[in-house]
């Protein structure tokens, strides 16, 4: 029982119950309606695996299932009528595994089954078409995977291994397109999906790519990418093809979604790396607002193209799951149908989901982001409690606008949250540390702890914003200014001391270099003086040497005649005079020879010869 109710500022209605906790509701949470076949009516196969859907002219839905046969659902009464395969009666569907359906221009239903052929139903009787060995006409394979009716009421039949068949209902003529044909061959005999463009061409999705078929000429072309060759289409197994109102072709595979803009010859690709919840694209439809809805193996998407100034497109999308009324996360291949009411119906492994674009209510509340926690060096920090000898927070982190951290505290984490409780797991967050990050980083609701390590000392601004379950971002950004103090060796006083020490060191180095240069200059000047003195001495010595050479020859010429005169002169007085002349001439010759010997010694041409002797006669000779 409900004992209290409360409606908050965001429009959520909270209900407090007796012994059963708290419940909440908002019209934007449950966006979709889902139907399932009642379990009490299932007598043999218990599942709601819906493979295909078609709406008849009365507005009833025909649903092909995996083992439960064909269901007719009356939306007004909510009642089901089930049609099962009957071996004993021809007026029944051909098989209980119905994997494809189509409605022709006459209102006739066509059912494709797994290994049981094709069935036509005019509202009264079922007519069966099977692959008859040896027959030139008729169905080429009993596993009919896809059906499509074109503008001329031709029925196109995609089979598992028989290629593509075309039945012209006005003439009863069958046309076949197969892999390996000499002309107009398709890529593969396994045809998974069919669609038609605005020109009447048939788009064929196979296990080996995509083909275009011109029904009037029978011409088959293979889709390899853009005409200019810049974007190449390489996916092989195609789950679904769909032509929209923009003349775009949407191609879904197990590797993501390709969108080909035929008018501008451009290709776009969306996959898990782009942000899609899953790469397996199963079904595609467009609503009246030109939003494209896509069933995947991990929820339902609505994709909105946005054109920029360069005529290129970007794509926004929302994903939905069972928490918002979707049948489940896994949708089936080609299990989608547009209804006369403007609704879309998507079948999956757990029922049928209706999408009514006109009635969907989106959550317009722009939730503010909140910083709810701080950790420093993996230690939780609380207000007014000391950490490492000082208090970091003087009030709760939620109310803090400025934060100072020591150099040893530059490894820190924030926990972020938002005040959006619609579907909190679908919230997203974007954060940026100005002064460190160059771009915003987006994270999911499961990644609410933001960590920074080893930031340099300085002032930063941490900014965070939140996105709600319907992709509405915060109007205001939550900011926190963070100052990381430098270590003691990087403070202003330390830097001033470093500058002074550097100046003194530079001065000492300059003085040292100056003294070395000055000493070198003095030594060079001294060497120049010595060199100059040596040159002067050398000049004098050369002069004396030359003069000595000039003296030596005349002295020799003087002494030789003197010797002869001394021998012939009889007069004692004259002889004494001659001896005096001879002795002084000899002395002068010895001095000349000594001067020449010194020159030889200086030129390293002679060596000093030492000898012993009586110095008295030597001195007497010199004196007298």
Model-derived features: positions:
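Residue-level detector of Asp-centered blade-edge/turn motifs that repeat once per structural unit
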Residues: 7-10, 55-58, 103-106, 149-152, ...
């Amino acid at each position: 029982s409900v004992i209290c109710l409360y409606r908050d500022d965001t429009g959520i209605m909270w209900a407090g119950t007796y012994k059963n906790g708290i419940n909440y509701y908002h019209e934007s949470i449950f966006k979709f309606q889902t139907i399932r076949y009642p379990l009490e009516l299932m007598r043999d196969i218990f599942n709601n695996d819906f493979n295909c859907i078609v709406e008849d002219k009365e507005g009833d839905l025909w649903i092909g299932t995996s083992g439960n046969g064909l269901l007719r659902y009356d939306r007004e009464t909510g009642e089901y009528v089930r049609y099962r395969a009957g071996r004993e009666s021809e007026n029944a569907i051909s098989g209980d595994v119905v994997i494809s359906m189509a409605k022709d221009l006459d209102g006739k239903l066509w059912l494709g089954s797994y290994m049981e052929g094709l069935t036509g139903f005019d509202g009264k009787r079922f007519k069966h078409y099977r692959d008859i060995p040896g027959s030139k006409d008729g169905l080429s394979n009993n596993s009919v995977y896809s059906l499509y009716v074109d503008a001329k009421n031709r029925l196109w039949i995609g089979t598992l291994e028989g290629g593509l068949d075309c039945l012209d209902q006005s003439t009863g003529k069958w046309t076949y397109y197969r892999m390996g044909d000499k002309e107009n061959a398709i890529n593969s005999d396994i045809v998974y999906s069919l669609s038609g463009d605005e020109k009447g061409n048939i788009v064929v999705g196979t296990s080996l790519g995509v083909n275009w078929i011109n029904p009037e000429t029978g011409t088959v072309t293979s889709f390899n990418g853009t005409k200019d060759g810049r974007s190449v289409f390489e996916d092989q197994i195609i789950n679904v093809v769909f032509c929209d109102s923009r003349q775009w072709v949407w191609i879904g595979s197990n590797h993501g979604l390709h969108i080909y803009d035929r008018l501008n010859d451009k290709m776009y690709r969306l996959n898990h790396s782009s942000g899609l919840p899953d790469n397996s694209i199963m079904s595609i439809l467009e609503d009246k607002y030109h939003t494209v809805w896509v069933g995947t193996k991990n929820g339902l998407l609505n994709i909105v193209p946005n054109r920029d100034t360069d005529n290129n497109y970007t794509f926004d999308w929302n994903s939905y799951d069972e928490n918002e009324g979707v049948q489940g996360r896994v949708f089936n291949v080609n299990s989608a149908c547009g209804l006369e009411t403007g609704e879309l119906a998507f079948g999956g492994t757990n029922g049928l989901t209706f999408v009514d674009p006109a009635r969907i209510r989106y959550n317009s509340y722009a939730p503010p982001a909140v910083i709810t926690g701080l950790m420093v060096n993996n230690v939780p920090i609380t207000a007014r409690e000391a950490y490492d000898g000082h208090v970091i927070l003087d009030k709760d982190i939620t109310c803090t606008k400025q934060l100072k951290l020591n150099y040893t505290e530059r490894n820190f984490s924030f926990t972020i949250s938002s005040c959006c409780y619609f579907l909190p797991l679908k919230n997203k967050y974007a954060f940026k540390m100005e002064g460190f990050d160059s771009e915003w980083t987006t994270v999911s609701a499961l990644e609410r702890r933001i960590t920074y390590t080893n930031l340099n000392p300085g002032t930063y601004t941490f900014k965070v914003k939140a996105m709600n379950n319907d992709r509405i971002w915060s109007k205001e950004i939550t900011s926190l200014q963070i100052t990381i103090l430098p270590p003691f060796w990087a403070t202003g006083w330390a830097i001033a001391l470093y500058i002074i020490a550097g100046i003194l060191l530079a001065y000492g180095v300059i003085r040292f270099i100056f003294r070395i240069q000055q000493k070198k200059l003095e030594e060079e000047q001294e060497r120049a003086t010595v060199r100059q003195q040596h040159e002067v001495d050398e000049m004098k010595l050369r002069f004396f040497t030359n003069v000595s050479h000039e003296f030596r020859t005349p002295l020799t010429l003087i002494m030789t005649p003197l010797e002869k005169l001394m021998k012939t002169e009889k007069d004692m007085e004259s002889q004494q005079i001659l001896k005096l002349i001879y002795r002084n001439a000899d002395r002068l010759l010895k001095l000349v020879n000594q001067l020449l010997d010194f020159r030889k010694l200086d030129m390293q041409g002679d060596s000093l010869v030492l000898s012993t002797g009586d110095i008295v006669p030597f001195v007497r000779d010199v004196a007298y």
